[in-house]
């Protein structure tokens, strides 16, 4: 198996596909139902993630992205059946709103890429989704139902994926242990707070983040929500407020 990816089993029918050799330590998740499989995020695109997925399942695979930033859609080109939120459709069809060279510089930072990957030829994925997903939609995999939650803030079309029956929340870049990014021009700190308030209402048992450590306890959602609320009360929940450190996580505004 390609050594770019690290494979872990969260459950018998849930596989974590990680890119630990990159500084962002991106995680993608393969959820298998009785009829089809769902791939949440497709990573950086350094190596062909579809080869790994095909070793895991022989069922039809639908790919979704928590949001269409370059580090979450790199493998989308291998999955014609992919979905996105309508708020990010222009980013997929009209060009990504960040200079290519900035992304390339960020891509290679502190990372030894495989010799087979030519960074100079890297292109940000562009394509038309097979379907658009909206808040409240349910993806039925056969014996497993995954609910779409529109959670903007980090990105306009950011989505979390909620498996109510198991209490599993796939949080993308909304929640993880490191520095949350709410400083890009396309981020919205106020929306970020509303999204945290939304997921804080859920009976979450397991958090599956898109980056860094997998040891994320559900209580971090409440702590993040409360921190955002405090910043808003102080008039600091806005771009330009800098980096605020909360111990096991931080926020850059």
Regions found by a protein language model. Give the residues of each.
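Conserved beta-strand hairpin/beta-sheet module of binuclear metal-dependent hydrolase folds
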Residues: 3-55, 160-172, 176
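Short Pro/Gly-enriched beta-strand edge/turn motifs at strand-loop
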Residues: 9-15, 117-121, 142-144
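Short glycine/proline-enriched coil/turn segments at helix->beta-strand junctions
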Residues: 34, 57-60, 76-82, 164-166, ...
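Metallo-beta-lactamase
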Residues: 37-39, 44-45, 124, 131, ...
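Active-site HxH/HxHxD metal-binding segment of metal-dependent hydrolases
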Residues: 46-138, 227-237
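C-terminal regulatory/interaction regions
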Residues: 235-253
